């Protein structure tokens, strides 16, 4: 078992990681090979389009590293599905978009590996709640 020097969590555009900030300084402070990480990350996420990919990088004392990519943030998936640039600054008053229940279920299925929900329905309710907090109206569904 290798000794862990540090764990770094970043959100990077898929296939477009560069040694510039935030990647360089975050990995540089642990002495990890920045170019090696950017090449490996870009190769692994090249097929994900322009999504933002959360990544957890574990850096070991011998300067080697491993990383785990996760599914895109829920807010990104909701904005993409609703076709909006950003959520509402006043979600209880100003609504900025609409999602139907099928879109909510699709996002829930995408996020299922990263959510600690017991079922797709529970995950869908989590997605619907996040959408509402962003000022996106959810139409249909079990409690519409």
Swiss-Prot record:
The protein, known as: Large ribosomal subunit protein uL11
UniProt keyword Ribosomal protein present: yes
Domain of life: Bacteria
SMART domains: RL11 (SM00649)
Record keywords: Methylation, Ribonucleoprotein, Ribosomal protein, RNA-binding, rRNA-binding
GO molecular function: large ribosomal subunit rRNA binding; structural constituent of ribosome
Taxonomy of the source species: Bacteria, Thermotogati, Deinococcota, Deinococci, Deinococcales
Gene3D superfamilies with a match to the protein in the record: Ribosomal protein L11, C-terminal domain, Ribosomal protein L11/L12, N-terminal domain
Annotated family: Belongs to the universal ribosomal protein uL11 family.
Residue stretches spanning the membrane: none
Gene: rplK
Alphabetical list of InterPro entries matching this protein: Ribosomal_uL11, Ribosomal_uL11_bac-typ, Ribosomal_uL11_C, Ribosomal_uL11_C_sf, Ribosomal_uL11_CS, Ribosomal_uL11_N, Ribosomal_uL11_N_sf
One BP term from GO: translation
Any GO CC annotation of this UniProt entry: cytosolic large ribosomal subunit
Post-translation changes: One or more lysine residues are methylated.
């Amino acid at each position: 078992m290798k000794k862990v020097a540090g764990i770094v969590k970043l959100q990077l555009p898929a296939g477009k990681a560069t040694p510039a900030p935030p990647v360089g300084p975050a990995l540089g402070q642990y002495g990890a090979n920045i170019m090696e990480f950017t090449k490996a990350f870009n190769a692994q996420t090249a097929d994900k389009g322009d999504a933002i990919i959360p990544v957890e990088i574990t850096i070991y004392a011998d300067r080697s590293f491993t990383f785990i990519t996760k599914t895109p943030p829920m807010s990104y998936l909701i904005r993409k599905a609703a076709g909006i640039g950003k959520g509402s600054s006043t979600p209880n008053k100003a609504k900025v978009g609409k999602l139907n229940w099928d879109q909510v279920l699709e996002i829930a299925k995408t996020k299922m590996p990263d959510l600690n929900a017991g079922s797709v329905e529970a995950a869908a309710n989590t997605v619907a709640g996040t959408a509402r907090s962003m000022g996106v109206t959810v139409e249909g569904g079990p409690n519409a």
